[in-house]
Amino acid sequence: MMKLRDLEFDFDISCPEDLERYLRCSEDMTQKAASAPPMPADVTSMDGLAAYKEWMTAYVKLLTDWIDGIFGDGACNKLLGPKTSLSAVLSLCDEIGEAAVQQGNAVGLQIRKYTPN
């Protein structure tokens, strides 16, 4: 189980199926990001702001789809609510990464416990 923001999800980075889903969703996100609009260099004009909104919308969708792909449909709404900002979803992605590292470290300790020197 992975605990994120007081919610528990049936996900364990040491479970082959869960790790496969994590890797597959990450690969899907990478492929979709290749066709996402580029981040505009200038956002000081109305056209620049419109381009920034398009870029931001695409990346929020990429990240929320990644989270829902890993933890199940609706997971992102449970974690962030229906109004999702880029900064909020990026913070959540950081939390997911930290939680996965913690799970991996816990398994590593168990492995070392039973591995001969």
Where are these regions (language model features)?
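Short acidic, glycine/proline-enriched loop segments that cap or flank alpha-helices
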Residues: 51-58, 80
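Short N-terminal mixed-charge amphipathic segments
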Residues: 1-52
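C-terminal charged interaction modules
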Residues: 74-117
